């Protein structure tokens, strides 16, 4: 087990839960199993394709840890003397852009009338970034992360921001970002931490 200082990032596809719920067609007996299977396969394919797009874009800068349902968790150990945070922020911008392009291209290329394909345009991307201490443990060849920073970033997901597409940074991250960037400050209690959050 190793204690490290670094960055944790969660890229979360918003609109995923209602998207999946809408396509659980087996709950509607009149639809039939064949149509239900068809719709479910397209819903799964869309989400998997978008998650692959997110991972592919982030991996040059951060290490992919694991999928958490509709979200991907990344980490990066801090290196002294390097401005890693700016590189992460730049990658967040390009990943959001490529995610939206991928959503639009999937909808256009497939030209499919099924509900999952038609509703895919409602899928958006939220990203959360925090800096702190975390533990890294290898269990059966998998790198498992734990610790206070990991708890904190997951608490960041539970906020009152109404938008379905945004970046959310902790104060620890903001200290290292370009001072010329303009952010909106939101003060919100994070359970067991009581820290304010910054979002753009």
Where are these regions (language model features)?
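Conserved small/polar residues in nucleotide/adenosyl-binding loops
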Residues: 198-200
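Short acidic-hydrophobic surface loop/beta-edge motif
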Residues: 188-196
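Catalytic NTP-binding/metal-coordinating core of nucleotidyl cyclase/transferase enzymes
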Residues: 1-90, 94
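Catalytic beta-strand-to-alpha-helix segment of the class III nucleotidyl cyclase homology domain
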Residues: 79-189
């Amino acid at each position: 087990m190793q204690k490290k200082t670094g960055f944790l990032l969660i890229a979360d596809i918003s609109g995923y839960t209602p998207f999946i719920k809408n396509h659980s067609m087996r709950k509607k007996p009149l639809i039939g199993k064949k149509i239900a299977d068809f719709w479910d396969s397209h819903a799964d394919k869309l989400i998997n394709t978008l998650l692959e797009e997110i991972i592919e874009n982030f991996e040059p800068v951060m290490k992919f840890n694991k999928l958490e349902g509709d979200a991907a968790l990344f980490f990066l150990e801090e290196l002294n003397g390097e401005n890693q945070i700016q590189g992460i922020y730049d990658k967040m911008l390009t990943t959001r852009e490529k995610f939206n392009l991928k959503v639009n291209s999937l909808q256009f290329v497939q030209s499919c009338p099924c509900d999952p394909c038609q509703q895919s345009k409602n899928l958006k991307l939220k990203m959360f970034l925090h800096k702190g201490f975390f533990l890294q443990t290898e269990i059966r060849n998998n790198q498992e992360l734990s610790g206070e920073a990991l708890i904190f970033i997951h608490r960041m997901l539970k906020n009152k921001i109404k938008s379905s597409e945004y970046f959310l940074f902790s104060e620890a991250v903001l200290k290292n970002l370009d001072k010329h960037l303009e952010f909106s400050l939101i003060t919100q209690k994070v359970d067991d931490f009581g820290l304010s959050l910054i979002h753009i």
